[in-house]
Amino acid sequence: RSSDLEHIQLTSELVDYISSQISEILNESLMISLSDHISFAIERQKQGIAFANPLMDSIHDYFPEELALGRYCVEEIRRKLDVALHEDEAGFIAMHIINARLHTNMGQVPDLTKLVNACAEIADTFYRGKLDKTTVAYERFLVHLKYLAKRLFHSQELPNVLSRDEEILDFVRRKFQKHYRCAK
């Protein structure tokens, strides 16, 4: 039988592992929010209650690293506490990791995910479905979208580098006309 202390100890190990896998400094609140989430998820599992994660597909597509870490956490919970959580719990845990990584609050994660999804769909539509989503270039594109979304959600001013250097802007407009139209 697992106790709150076991949940906290395991969460501490999981947060240490997550931190070792992510280059950014995570929000310190991850330990508390993840510990609470894990405790409640285990309690729900014992009561036979499972929640579907409506963002699972988007998390899978746009936050694969965080989802992989969420799956790792679910597996560690199964291995160390003998509790088999539903697959969607990996997505919920990923949302906590996204929140900690981007320093947003949990209420913003669904909106952030929707924004990244909408921008990626605009680009995919613009290029008529020809974006290769398995490439490093596409992964970098998603990273840029995530950080754009983070800055927007934090109401940070976006640096307008191109407007400060008309020569660069003119070069981009001429050399990368199609990409410029998509971004615009």
Residue positions per predicted region:
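A cross-family "folded-core" feature that marks the main globular domain of proteins
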Residues: 1-184
